[in-house]
Swiss-Prot record:
Membrane topology: Multi-pass membrane protein
GO molecular function, one term: manganese ion binding
Gene Ontology CC annotations of this record: endoplasmic reticulum exit site; endoplasmic reticulum-Golgi intermediate compartment membrane; Golgi apparatus
Species of the source: Xenopus laevis (African clawed frog)
Entry protein name: Metallophosphoesterase 1
Cofactor descriptive note: Binds 2 manganese ions per subunit.
Alphabetical keyword list: ER-Golgi transport, GPI-anchor biosynthesis, Hydrolase, Manganese, Membrane, Metal-binding, Transmembrane, Transmembrane helix, Transport
Residue intervals passing through the bilayer: 31-51, 369-389
Entry cofactors: Mn(2+)
Enzyme class: hydrolase
Ligand binding (a divalent metal cation 2): 78, 120, 261, 317
UniProt GO BP: endoplasmic reticulum to Golgi vesicle-mediated transport; GPI anchor biosynthetic process
Amino acid sequence: MMFKHLVPLRNGFNKERTSRLKARLFFLSTIFGSILLVFFFCEFLVYYLVIVKCSWPEVKGAHKEDSTPVLKVMFLADTHLLGEIRGHWLDKLRREWQMERSYQSALWLLQPDIVFILGDVFDEGKWSIPQAWSSDVARFQKMFRHPPHTQLIVLVGNHDIGFHYDMTVYKLSRFEKTFNFTSGKLVSPKGINHILSSSFVLLNSMALEGDDCHICRAAEDQLRRISIKLNCSRMREHPDFQKKCKNVEKTPVSAPILLQHYPLYRISDSECTGEDSASPEEKKVLFKEKYDVLSQDASEKLLQLLQPRLILSGHTHSACEVLHQGKIPEISVPSFSWRNRNNPSFIMGSITATKYSLAKCFLPTENTIIYIYCTASVLLTGYVLACLWLCICQRIHSGRKQKPI
């Protein structure tokens, strides 16, 4: 019983120890919880919060009670998946995660019927050896996976097979085999809304050089065959229809939508407007035919042969709207990747057999994500310093209380 007076001291010591342990656990859980919360927001949640604001545009003149099917289409461009030559692992990880989360979030929220990627899928396809190509394709298929009810169609770009004089039969065949792509392919989505609602013409821009090369000649022959199909679809009421179009495959009566990587000929981006158009310095640069845009001759030939109602293209990485022949609009789709622009986006189209309506959906900007991470880092650092200062002050105060007189 002689140590009975030490029991309160021991209890007080245990309480103080428990209190300190709880304080440390609270401190650590706050730090790690905050880090996880910021990470979850920036790498997952922010994509849903931004894309959920986008909605399919209504087709003017089409009523909800109307039985005319509306095709919901997403158009994106210039994903530029990095390869083994120029692709730093951190750059590859960051930008490809951004595109994967953007794409998967858009699919889940918007439920498109069909998705078109307008070329330059890869950054180093023109150089890739077979092993590197297989690796890049596997990464692409993982990033742009999609449910069975959504169709994904990929067009070829100059970074996939090279510019005209770098393009070879081997590289083109490799791309065509991987993505089931053919220049001059006429796509009429069947099974979607159970009707042929519209036609899309897919082109290999690099094969429109006009120099009668083997690849170019095959592409132009296919283009002429498509022109015949489209002309026959327009003359079904003509007296000579059966005579001229007896053995021609039927296509939707509507004018087609032309999809390709290069824009049609224009002098520059000087007339382009919008927050995601080219910078003032880039707008001053004159475009080079057959490199930045199609040649003037090839552009006029396409408009004459196909008579499209709408054109969508990529390649420039910036947005632009151009009116050809005073009646045919062309939309240049900005890049989908942070690597090419800070504010990537994609185009949403509601399309019927005779009408269409387009809207743009912006993705989270890279600057926003960086700002959130920096702000969170500053706040957490301030919190840690404040806790350390408070701990030091408490120890000093505790030491003074226990100091003997």
